[in-house]
Structures are given as structure tokens and as C-alpha cells.
């Protein structure tokens, strides 16, 4: 969520009119809609995209949850960029993922649906996220793990 707001802020400051779909809210121009799911149902996402175009948005930042991927809420979408920050066992349980492997597999699905992937090279689960990816890969990190070194 924090990353989504940071990326949106960077895009806005760079002159892009940017919509947001995320855990807390959806922002369409001046309109703010409280979120009920991080990744809404696909027909709602399509409705939001249409409203964003009508509001003059030229970019969208969207949080895509493992649940959203697992439930095919973004099936058929091609994202320009996908960002992997980290993977922690916080979505395991009867209402989400049966185990960590299922959670990781669902998260990694994003990188079969984007053109460019930006990955945290310091995360111990990086290899799992790269399994089966079809996107260009860029890594960043604090250690010697990334193509881009963070200072």
C-alpha cells in the first residue's frame, strides 16, 4: 500500500494524472471511493479504468493482491510494470491461502502478466517470484543483490 502511494506521488509530481486502485481506496480524478477489496472484481476494475480515462487519467497505480490473482480478477490484463517488494507469511489461512507455497505461487502470477518486473533483490523469496516469469527483470537492493544499488 505504501509503495502504491509513493509511486502515484512520483507520477503525479512528474506531470501524470494518475488514478489509484488499492487496499484503502480508489482514486479517480477528484473522486475517492472507499475500497472493500484490494483488487476489486474484474468488471469493477474495468469500470474504474473507464472512469479514469473519462477523468483524464493517463496512468494508473494498482495494488494487485495474491487473492486478486488467485481469483482471476485481473486475468487477461497486461501491466506495464509489476513491482515485488517482499513476501511474508501474513496471508495464510482458511480465507486466503492454504499455505506459504500457495501464497508465493499466486503472488508470482503477476510476473506472467507484466512487461517489466522490478524486484527487491534482497528478499529471500526472490527466486520463487522469478519462477515462470515472462517479463523483463530489473533488481534493486541494499546489498550486492541488485542491478540497481540502493544507498
Regions from the PLM with identified roles:
Residues 25-33, 83-90:
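Acidic/polar active-site rim loop that often engages polyanionic ligands
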